[in-house]
């Protein structure tokens, strides 16, 4: 059954509903039976169901020009009342707004997916950074420990060397003091003896040794 046949049958069904339950059902002065909420609700549901199907078929057949279709205009005119008019307007508004709704929804879904991708990328990058930190630590730690041990050993040896040098300097100072005493005594003896040390090479050599020495360890 094509769309035209379906539309024809549904139009007949809708008109039959309207014939069985005239427009006074939704008028301002309903009858006793028409006040029954269950009956009214059932009738509204039936009309709404037919109207939704009709509207969908008209949209498939006529597209955006549905309101300019002659058959649709006749049906709309025959069923013009507060209930059907409201239903039609609501359906038409909803159908027109679907494009405006779907676009933000699709964009929101896309942004959510992109956000998840970014969060996943950040998490992965953070994990990689932590791995690199651990790798750097594993490579540098032995070197740092080795350098630290070398510095401690050097500091220990430097302290030992300094102590040894200080001991040597102390011995040199003592030797220098003793030498000064011997030099002074020797010079006095040679000068007081009246012997000319210029004519005696050995005495000249001794006097030369007793001269002022350039080495002075007092500054150490």
UniProtKB/Swiss-Prot annotation:
Keywords: Cell cycle, Cell division, Centromere, Chromosome, Chromosome partition, Kinetochore, Microtubule, Mitosis, Nucleus. One of its GO terms (cellular component) is cytosol. It is found in: Nucleus; Chromosome, Centromere, Kinetochore. The keyword Cell division applies. One of its GO terms (biological process) is cell division. It holds the Pfam family CENP-H. Its main location: nucleus. Component of the kinetochore, a multiprotein complex that assembles on centromeric DNA and attaches chromosomes to spindle microtubules, mediating chromosome segregation and sister chromatid segregation during meiosis and mitosis. Component of the inner kinetochore constitutive centromere-associated network (CCAN), which serves as a structural platform for outer kinetochore assembly. Fta2, fta3 and fta4 associate with the central core (cnt) and inner repeat (inr) region of the centromere. Belongs to the CENP-H/MCM16 family. Component of the inner kinetochore constitutive centromere-associated network (CCAN) (also known as central kinetochore Sim4 complex in fission yeast), which is composed of at least cnl2, cnp3, cnp20, fta1, fta2, fta3, fta4, fta6, fta7, mal2, mhf1, mhf2, mis6, mis15, mis17, sim4 and wip1. This is Inner kinetochore subunit fta3. The gene is fta3.
């Amino acid at each position: 059954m094509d769309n035209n046949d379906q539309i024809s049958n549904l139009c007949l069904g809708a008109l039959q509903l309207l014939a069985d339950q005239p427009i006074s059902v939704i008028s301002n002065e309903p009858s006793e039976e028409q006040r029954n909420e269950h009956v009214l609700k059932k009738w509204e549901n039936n009309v709404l169901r037919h109207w939704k199907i009709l509207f969908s078929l008209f949209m498939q057949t006529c597209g955006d020009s549905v309101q300019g279709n002659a058959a649709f205009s006749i049906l709309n005119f025959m069923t013009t009342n507060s209930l059907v008019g409201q239903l039609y307007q609501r359906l038409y508004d909803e159908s027109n707004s679907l494009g405006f709704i779907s676009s933000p929804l699709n964009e929101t879904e896309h942004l959510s997916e992109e956000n998840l991708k970014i969060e996943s990328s950040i998490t992965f990058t953070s994990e990689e950074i932590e791995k690199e930190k651990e790798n750097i630590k594993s490579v540098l730690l032995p070197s740092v420990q080795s350098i630290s041990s070398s510095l401690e050993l050097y500091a220990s040896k430097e302290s030992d060397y300094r102590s040894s040098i200080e001991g040597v300097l102390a011995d040199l100072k003592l030797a220098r003091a003793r030498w000064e005493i011997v030099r002074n005594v020797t010079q006095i003896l040679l000068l007081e003896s009246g012997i000319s040390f210029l004519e005696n090479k050995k005495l000249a050599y001794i006097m030369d040794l007793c001269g002022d020495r350039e080495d002075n360890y007092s500054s150490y």
